């Protein structure tokens, strides 16, 4: 009986702690529309960037709970999430606050992720990033 009670308290405390963690992140989310995993498309592809419970603002505009989108294309490893994202052919910045784009891609296999970062291109403490999507261009 004592073991059962200890397990119950442990589970209860874990549950309460997980709620606190969830509140710290809130119900913020990010979504990339226009491509799905393991599908084939013709170029150009039209992508829509959706973020919930955050404000989309241009780079340089410092405002709480805001930022802008970045596309990570064909990255094997994520960049350092504690520093501003570099601007490369594989890390595309949408610093004007764009919420969609059209990508002209050559035939082949691609991976893509959407990442929401602050006014300085630095990912938020709890990064808003989509899962990696693999797709093909014919």
Task: Identify the meaning behind each predicted range.
Residues 23-42:
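Short, compositionally biased P/S/T/A/G/V-rich stretches that sit at domain boundaries
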Residues 125-138:
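Short beta-strand elements
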Residues 6-16:
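Sec-dependent N-terminal signal peptides
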Residues 85-119:
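Short, solvent-exposed, Trp/other aromatic-anchored flexible loops in extracytoplasmic proteins
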Residues 78-80, 117-125:
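Short acidic/polar inter-strand loop motif in beta-rich domains
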Residues 61-69, 129:
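Short coil-to-beta strand junction motifs in C2/discoidin
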Residues 50-61:
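Short amphipathic, basic-aromatic surface patches that mediate peripheral association
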Residues 16-22:
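N-terminal signal peptide c-region/cleavage motif recognized by signal peptidases
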């Amino acid at each position: 009986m004592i073991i059962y009670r200890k397990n119950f308290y442990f589970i209860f405390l874990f549950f309460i702690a997980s709620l606190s963690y969830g509140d710290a992140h809130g119900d913020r989310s990010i979504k990339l529309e226009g491509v799905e995993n393991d599908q084939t498309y013709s170029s150009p592809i039209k992508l829509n960037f959706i973020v919930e419970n955050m404000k989309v603002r241009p780079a340089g505009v410092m405002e709480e709970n805001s930022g802008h989108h970045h596309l990570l294309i064909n990255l094997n490893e994520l960049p350092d999430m504690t520093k501003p994202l570099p601007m490369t052919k594989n890390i595309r910045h949408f610093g004007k606050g764009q919420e969609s784009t059209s990508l002209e891609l050559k035939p082949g296999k691609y991976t893509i992720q959407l990442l929401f970062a602050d006014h300085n291109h630095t990912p938020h403490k709890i990064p808003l990033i989509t899962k990696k999507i693999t797709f093909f261009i014919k």
